[in-house]
Amino acid sequence: MRSLTAAARRPEVLLLLLCILQPSQPGGVPGAVPGGVPGGVFFPGAGLGGLGVGGLGPGVKPAKPGVGGLVGPGLGAEGSALPGAFPGGFFGAGGGAAGAAAAYKAAAKAGAAGLGVGGIGGVGGLGVSTGAVVPQLGAGVGAGVKPGKVPGVGLPGVYPGGVLPGAGARFPGIGVLPGVPTGAGVKPKAQVGAGAFAGIPGVGPFGGQQPGLPLGYPIKAPKLPAGYGLPYKTGKLPYGFGPGGVAGSAGKAGYPTGTGVGPQAAAAAAKAAAKLGAGGAGVLPGVGVGGPGIPGAPGAIPGIGGIAGVGAPDAAAAAAAAAKAAKFGAAGGLPGVGVPGVGVPGVGVPGVGVPGVGVPGVGVPGVGVPGVGVPGVGVPGVGVPGVGVPGALSPAATAKAAAKAAKFGARGAVGIGGIPTFGLGPGGFPGIGDAAAAPAAAAAKAAKIGAGGVGALGGVVPGAPGAIPGLPGVGGVPGVGIPAAAAAKAAAKAAQFGLGPGVGVAPGVGVVPGVGVVPGVGVAPGIGLGPGGVIGAGVPAAAKSAAKAAAKAQFRAAAGLPAGVPGLGVGAGVPGLGVGAGVPGLGVGAGVPGPGAVPGTLAAAKAAKFGPGGVGALGGVGDLGGAGIPGGVAGVVPAAAAAAKAAAKAAQFGLGGVGGLGVGGLGAVPGAVGLGGVSPAAAAKAAKFGAAGLGGVLGAGQPFPIGGGAGGLGVGGKPPKPFGGALGALGFPGGACLGKSCGRKRK
């Protein structure tokens, strides 16, 4: 009894322990009841059928609950003394029979026995599970069975390939792809219009699986190739296949377009060949014979054009060589009878009768033109390049060699046209044995310069050429005479400095040099001594050019010139304002031009445009006119430059004086404006309308007489139409001929 009582208390202790222990959560439903503590751990003799891995023993039916749902200790058939009475502990997790029943019910829902892993040994019902196990990929469920929810399980054709019967026939050959989840809306799509068999190898327009891509890729069915089904396209089938192996739409035999092969490519080649024309028929295929045909035309077989034959060389090359040879002249004389060699340079050729008998000299070029039989009798041609034609050499090569040889002259021949050094027969090789080449070259060069003929008089004009220009003759030595052009040039240059020193009445000698009796006045200032010479009556035709050059070369204030230089000195008849027949100028005698009155060359240049003036009434008789200081001694008045500037400005208006004839500008001191005649500037202005009249005494403040003074109408001047010469007296503007008011303005 004692042992039974002690044994009966053990469940109480175990219950107490169960109250203290916390239930294990990770165990989950599977294995909660089964998989308790193995038998024999807490209850000796429990064995594998008790709380072991399998819970209930093999083939053992679970005990039914006792009366009232509770089993008293040691009572009933299911007493605690029986091993394995209650799986998973004394009363299970729920306590008593009810708890055990609940545990069994939960275990039944969890699945068949044998799936769970035994929990940790200890109190029954607290076993730890590893969680849900993902079944491995396999053949899945059978046909007609709903596939499970686990990814990859239950779908037909789990692995690529393989057509499964039944439900799997809808997607033959398309299985679940590794790494691609299913059930997320990703479904294989059939090609447009392809029906249910799209994607099946060999069925439908799609060619099936592509090389390098796993089956099922791309996820979306690929699009049709560009231009598929159109009437005009590349001619290639899509992906190289057609539906059912039949050629696709718009397919055609032969090579596809654009590959460079086929009729289109041949047509293009023929079109290009047509531009070049058809090849002529050559003797040998591909080798045309040079002839009248088009040079280079391909033969029967397009290839090498005609080969230049023995025919004449290219005309262009021959012409070029001939043109070059022509620069040095042809050998021999004028084309005639004889051939260079026989009568070539020798008999009547340059040499014997050539430049010699009638050569320049004796019968100077003209009489016996260069040479009796000079180049003319014997002409290069008959026997020269002709009789002894230059071997097999072509004319072009011969001409080229001859042209080059002509530069250095021909080699001397032996005898009269004898056998040349290197040639055979008369004429020999062109250029060898032809002595005319050198003379011809010299003659050609001389021809550029022209032959010197016998001039009319030696030196007058370089000798005129003879009848036929030849070698320079004995004619006058060129250069002895004064050519018109050279003389004109020299005269023009000399005109800048004047002709020769003038002589003047009393060259440059005044009462007191630089002072004069009355500075710049004289008895009748501006009249002068001797006849004043007609203005411009000096040099005739050349006056204009000389005056123009003199005007350009005039020297302003402070520049002295030697005696008699045009512009200031008195010269012989040259147009000017000087006294006597002196050189045009303003000073008397050979005075040195200086800052006195403005040089008269300007007026002369202006007057020269209108021709020489008429002969003045009086030649300008003054007591001491022109014997004043030769305007060149600078000095008593302000500086030469200032005086010249003032004089130039005053000259624009001028002072009354003898119109155009007297000795103008003989001031007291060179550079100062004297009371004498009209200044050159005024004279230049007045010169447009003719020479001024004589008028009264200048510079005394007198009123301008009618027709006199600077503005009056001079001798021979044409009076204005309205009032004749009374304009000045009547007070009309322009009476004094001030500036542009005199007469009609020029446009």
Curated annotation (Swiss-Prot):
Q: Which residues form the signal peptide?
A: 1-26
GO molecular function, a single term: extracellular matrix structural constituent
- Asked whether the keyword Ion transport is assigned, the reply is no
Give the modified residues of type Hydroxyproline.
P188
Per its UniProt record, what InterPro entries does this chain match? Tropoelastin (IPR003979)
Family classification: Belongs to the elastin family.
Q: Which protein is depicted?
A: Elastin
Q: Which organism is it from?
A: Bos taurus
